[in-house]
Structure formats: structure tokens, C-alpha cells
From Swiss-Prot:
Binds 1 Mg(2+) ion per subunit. The keyword Metal-binding applies. Its cofactor is Mg(2+). It comes from Loxosceles laeta. One of its GO terms (biological process) is killing of cells of another organism. This is Dermonecrotic toxin LlSicTox-alphaIV2iii. Expressed by the venom gland. CDD domains: GDPD_like_SMaseD_PLD. Keywords: Cytolysis, Dermonecrotic toxin, Disulfide bond, Hemolysis, Lipid degradation, Lipid metabolism, Lyase, Magnesium, Metal-binding, Secreted, Toxin.
Length: 276
């Protein structure tokens, strides 16, 4: 998956897809009560990027739903996966559960439109800290009594992006009601302004490939330097989050990679662990 980073304006959806992305990451900002309010990252962010682009949440989710609904004039078949980078550090932790419920309602009614046929992209809920796990728990429990529980079970995955201990991550996912390999993505990375080793990525890949692991997919963020991308691919990641999707698309055509990797399509299940 080529994961377009920090796609927070409606026009950026097509911009990143046109550059070769088949996935986007969207930053979700919340009000002080934990209700989703805007798409917004804020400063600091990545080098050579504007950090303050924003849309009202309802407007962006409406556009995102259109872009991922077959038959809609704005449908883009390339967009198969959306990572919601949930900025849950801006409100009191006591509101985490209610915030997760509110975001579940947003997805159900504004993205899926209360229908099996709208908003088909797979979704990853990405939390910045392990102690925010009640957001995931609440999101999942919202659908326990819903006729749309099948969409939760088919289309929603989970990630913690704070580079915390992976053994503890497994424990916390269990607390949130998420079983081993139940749609678990594991990210590792840092701003593109700083070089980061692949040690933790390789550790995550080893867990992914272990018979007793809990991870389905591993991705690295945020890179676009050719050497860094090649190194990440050689480490066997499943996704790369980037500001320059065309760089990754070009590298995938190189002799060293063209027979080892291909761009994921909607037929490729992001919850299945790939076996070579």
C-alpha cells in the first residue's frame, strides 16, 4: 500500500491518488469534549509540507464517501484503504470512550451512509497512545447492537502509532476487545525531517511472520528518499506512508522489486497476513 500522508483537504484526495497512492492518511482533530471536528494536523509536521490544511469533518467525510462509492461520479477505484490518524491527545482521557462512540456514528452515518453499498474503503483507526485504547473499545461496542456490525467485522482495522512497546500493544489490543491478527496494523516511524533506523520495523515484521504473532500488516512512515524506500521494501513492509507517492510507485517498477511487490487493489484483503 502506498499511503499518502496528511491528506486533509478534499482536493488532496485526487492529488495523492493521481501521484500513485492507493491509500490515504487523514488527520482527525477533536473538540475539547472529544467530538470529531476537523481534518487537521497542525505544527510541527513534515519537512516541505503545509501543516495547517483543514476541512470541516462532515465535508471531508462526505467527499471521502463519494470517492469510495462505486457508481458515484467521483469514485476512485484506486482508493482502497484509509488510515484515520486520530488526534486524541487534545481532550480529557475521561472522554475517550464517548469520543470513540461519536466517531463510530460518524463512520456509520456519514461515511457508510447507513448502507452496505457506500464508502467501501477499508479503514484503519490509528491511535497515538496505548492508553487511549478505550476509543477502539467504544467504536467496536457501538456496533454490537447495530445492523452494520458486518461492516465493522469486514472493513475496520486498528493501529497504535506512538512507537510504544509491542508486547504491551498486544495486551492493550486485547483490553480493547481486539484479538491477535484481528485486523491489526503496526506502524513505525517518525517525521521525514529525521532519519530513523529500521530496527523496530524489522521487529514488527518478525512478529507478523511468527506463528504466534498478533500483527497482520506492518507499515513505515514518513519517507520518500529513494534509499529509505528501498531499505523499507527490503525489510518486507506491507505499506509505506509518504508525501511523494510517485517515488514509491517508481521504485516498485525497478528490477529489484517489480517481481516481489505489486500495488494492492481492492481484492487484496488488508487484514490477511501475506505469505511468500
Amino acid at each position: 500500500w502506498i499511503m499518502g500522508h496528511m491528506v486533509n483537504k478534499i482536493e488532496q484526495i485526487n492529488e495523492f491518488l493521481d501521484l500513485g497512492a492507493n491509500s490515504i492518511e487523514v488527520d482527525i482533530a477533536f473538540d475539547e469534549l472529544g467530538y470529531p471536528e476537523y481534518t487537521y494536523h497542525g505544527v510541527p509536521c513534515d519537512c516541505k509540507r503545509y501543516c495547517t490544511k483543514s476541512e470541516k469533518i462532515d465535508d471531508f467525510i462526505e467527499a471521502l464517501s463519494a470517492a469510495t462509492t462505486p457508481g458515484n461520479p467521483k469514485f476512485r477505484k484506486e482508493l482502497t484503504l484509509v488510515v484515520f490518524d486520530l488526534k486524541t491527545g487534545g481532550f480529557d482521557a475521561s472522554r475517550m470512550y464517548k469520543s470513540g462512540k461519536a466517531f463510530a456514528e460518524l463512520i456509520q452515518f456519514s461515511y457508510w451512509k447507513g448502507s452496505d453499498d457506500a464508502g467501501r474503503a477499508y479503514i484503519v483507526l490509528s491511535l497515538p497512545k496505548l492508553d487511549h485504547y478505550e476509543f477502539i473499545k467504544a467504536f467496536r461496542e457501538h456496533f454490537d447492537t447495530s445492523t452494520f456490525k458486518n461492516l465493522l467485522e469486514e472493513r475496520v482495522g486498528y493501529d497504535f502509532s506512538g512507537n510504544e512497546d509491542m508486547g504491551l500493544t498486544r495486551v492493550v489490543l486485547d483490553k480493547a476487545g481486539v484479538n491477535d491478527r484481528e485486523h491489526v496494523w503496526q506502524g513505525d516511524g517518525i517525521t521525514n525531517c529525521i532519519l530513523r533506523s529500521l530496527d523496530r520495523v524489522k521487529a514488527a515484521v518478525a512478529i507478523r511472520d511468527s506463528a504466534t504473532g498478533y500483527i497482520n500488516k506492518v507499515y513505515f512512515w514518513t519517507i520518500q528518499a529513494y534509499s529509505s524506500v528501498r531499505d523499507a521494501l527490503n525489510a518486507e513492509v506491507d505499506g509505506i506512508m509518504t508525501n511523494e507517492p510517485d517515488v514509491i510507485a517508481n521504485i516498485l517498477k525497478e528490477d529489484a522489486f517489480k517481481d516481489r511487490f505489486r500495488l494492492a487493489t481492492y481484492r487484496d484483503n488488508p487484514w490477511e497476513t501475506f505469505k511468500r
